[in-house]
Each structure stands twice: as structure tokens, then as C-alpha cells.
Amino acid sequence: MPHSYDYDAIVIGSGPGGEGAAMGLVKQGARVAVIERYQNVGGGCTHWGTIPSKALRHAVSRIIEFNQNPLYSDHSRLLRSSFADILNHADNVINQQTRMRQGFYERNHCEILQGNARFVDEHTLALDCPDGSVETLTAEKFVIACGSRPYHPTDVDFTHPRIYDSDSILSMHHEPRHVLIYGAGVIGCEYASIFRGMDVKVDLINTRDRLLAFLDQEMSDSLSYHFWNSGVVIRHNEEYEKIEGCDDGVIMHLKSGKKLKADCLLYANGRTGNTDSLALQNIGLETDSRGQLKVNSMYQTAQPHVYAVGDVIGYPSLASAAYDQGRIAAQALVKGEANAHLIEDIPTGIYTIPEISSVGKTEQQLTAMKVPYEVGRAQFKHLARAQIVGMNVGTLKILFHRETKEILGIHCFGERAAEIIHIGQAIMEQKGGGNTIEYFVNTTFNYPTMAEAYRVAALNGLNRLF
């Protein structure tokens, strides 16, 4: 006799991965509950990560644009804004996103339960509710989409009022004059751009020998130069020995013997999965040292009825990928297999000022693979649209096979790079010979547009062939 459960599936977490899974499940007729530990849906992406940091970046970049525009750039009219004012803009965006996502669940009759979930046995969850009560919930299957949080080394005092992580930085109550950022990954570089754009002194401590080493080296070098040119001090190959909070700021002692002092520290060196409170040992699951779960191609864990998506499974740790992972897991959960799968070349968008975006192979990868490739480039400063709007900093680079003309990689540095990249991505995904750099020469672009950079870069690259 079949067992009766409260739900067909319970999704733990309402971030992009949880939302993708929940929507995919209810659209297939499943009875679904979503457990969210916080009062509002959306997860870290909406409340502490992607949305607020990009809203901050947008506000700061508009201030920079205003102050650099020759129409407004006389010194009597310089635009200034406090960190608190800019945070208010981010709050408005967060509220809009929360209302919209709450509506998705309500329209699709997907139940939202608030509290902390922990496994009791293979098909039972205990839900610790905000009022102190404990509910017992059963489901045939589960999707773990509980996300991640900033990694906290034990020797750093995050209770100090001037020591922040990438979540708590959004609750900063003072006006920073000098910021130390430890960790020059994506988050560290994005916040370095934001603070420097607000005319705050920034020291960026990088534990490696160059910024964002996964990028094409020209893109990484462009960011380094732009930081240097704007006054960001980058210190490569450094690790902290000790971090001490004091009354007026933070002192960082580096293993190299250097000492740095600033009025606050943003620690942005790694993240860890939010799995420690799930009591996974009760269902025979183990995580790695960073709290992450291993999954197969259908996002099943070692327990076939338990799936995991998003940051909690590690790479690529992107909101865009998490939503797709949730959708794929939902299909596998209901049908036993998934027809869809993540695309091989996931685009990368890094929201520094200016933006960086890429898809496909880098020059370094193609050289190591001994692929005969050629390069086509377009400088933004030569595009009419960029000249009109004053976006002179930037470049688009297309890597393509010398013989087949197949596009192998696209890399963009400059304002709107994360949007521009998708034009090239669409062509790269074409089958049956449709992926060719000649498309950009044989099609007609609106004029003037930033998209026209593809035509310029394609002509530049094809003219190099002999």
C-alpha cells in the first residue's frame, strides 16, 4: 500500500534554485511546500547578494557618469551621495523583487512555510517555527536549495562593528573613508568598484597573483589597470596573519610583515553552504569542508529522493544557473529523468565598474589546447553610440577558429558588457554551422548601437586571415 505524505516534494530555500524547483514542480501538478527561514522569499540573491549589490553599483555608476559628463562637470555641481542614501535605493529594488516573487508562489498555489528545517528521517522534516513551536512535515522527495553564506574564519571577530562580510556590509551605519577589502574574487572586486566610485580609499588584498584568474588575461589586466587608474591599491599574493578591531577602525597584519589600517574591513574570501543546521546525518548525507553537497547530472544527492541545487552544490554558484538547476531537478524529480541540462558555456557577468562578461574559451585555454584561433577586436571609443553616451572605456574581443570560422569565445570589458555578451552567446549556441563569425558581417545592425561592436570586431578578425 503506497505511503501517504503531506507533500509530493518539499523545497528548502526560496532563492533562485528553490524558486526554479518549486515553479517547475507545481507546473507539473505536484503538491509542493517551500520552507524559508526568513520572513520574505528570495533568498540571499534578493536580500544580501546579487540584487542589492547590483542596485548599489548602478546608483554609484550613475553618480560617476553625471560627474564625468562635460554638461554637468563644473565643480559647483558635483553630485555626492551618502552610503545610506544609496542603500535606500537598494532597499526599494529588494522590496519590488520580494513582492514579485511572493506573487509567483501565490498564483501557483505553492505553500510557503517560515522556519528552520531539519531532517528527522528520510521522509520527515521538523520545522522550527518563529513562534517557538515545532511542526512535523513529510514528503516523498526533497530539494535542498538553502544557499550559502560568507565564510567566517574563526580568528576574525565578525561581531566587531567595523568588520563586515558581504551580507552585513549592507547594514553599514557609518560613512566609510577608507575600506580594506580582503579577498579579490568577484564580490571583492565588485565592492572595490562601488566604494572607489563613492570616492572612498580602497585597499584590495588579493591572496593570488592576479585578479580573477579564471578570466581571459586581457580582461583581468584591463580591470587591474582600471582599478590602478582610479586609485584602488591592489596588494597581490598577500594573506593575513592577524586582524584586530580597534575603536576607530581595523588593523590588518599581513604574513609579509606589512600592517594596514582602515576605518572598516570587508572580508570577502569565500562562502560556505548553509547545511549545518539541516541534520543531514539523519538521512545519511555528508557535506565537504565548505558545507557543499555532491550531486549527479540530475542534481540527485547520494540519497536518490533528495536533490540539491544552487550555491549549496558549489560551482558555478550563479543565480542564473541555480534557477535552471532547480528547473532541471524538478523535471527529474517528477519524471525520473531530465531532458534539459545546463548549457556547456555558461556566461559570466562581473558587475565591476565597468562590467566584465565572457562566454566560451579564453586565449590562454585555446593556446594550451593548440587550437589555431584568431582574434577580432572592437574598441568602444570607436563606436558612435559609445561616443554619444560617453562610454569610451571598453572593448569586445571575439576568438574564432582560423579555418572553420567557428566562434570559440567572446570577452567584453565595458559598460553593459553583461548585456552585450548575450548577442554573441546566441550565435555560439547555433547548431549545423550556424556558429560562425561571418554572421556578424552578413547581418545588418541598427546604427548607432553598442551591438555594432560585433560587426567591427568580426571585420577586424577576418581581416587578419591570410
UniProtKB/Swiss-Prot annotation:
Cofactor note: Binds 1 FAD per subunit.
Protein location: Cytoplasm
Cofactor: FAD
Superkingdom of origin: Bacteria
Enzyme class: oxidoreductase
Annotated GO CC locations: cytosol
Keywords of this entry: Cytoplasm, FAD, Flavoprotein, NAD, NADP, Oxidoreductase
BP GO annotations: 2-oxoglutarate metabolic process; NADP metabolic process
UniProt catalytic activity: NAD(+) + NADPH = NADH + NADP(+)
Function: Conversion of NADPH, generated by peripheral catabolic pathways, to NADH, which can enter the respiratory chain for energy generation.
Family: Belongs to the class-I pyridine nucleotide-disulfide oxidoreductase family.
Assembly and oligomerization: Homooligomer; probable homooctamer.
UniProt xrefs under HAMAP family: SthA
Protein name, per record: Soluble pyridine nucleotide transhydrogenase
Protein's organism: Escherichia coli O6:H1 (strain CFT073 / ATCC 700928 / UPEC)
Gene coding for it: sthA
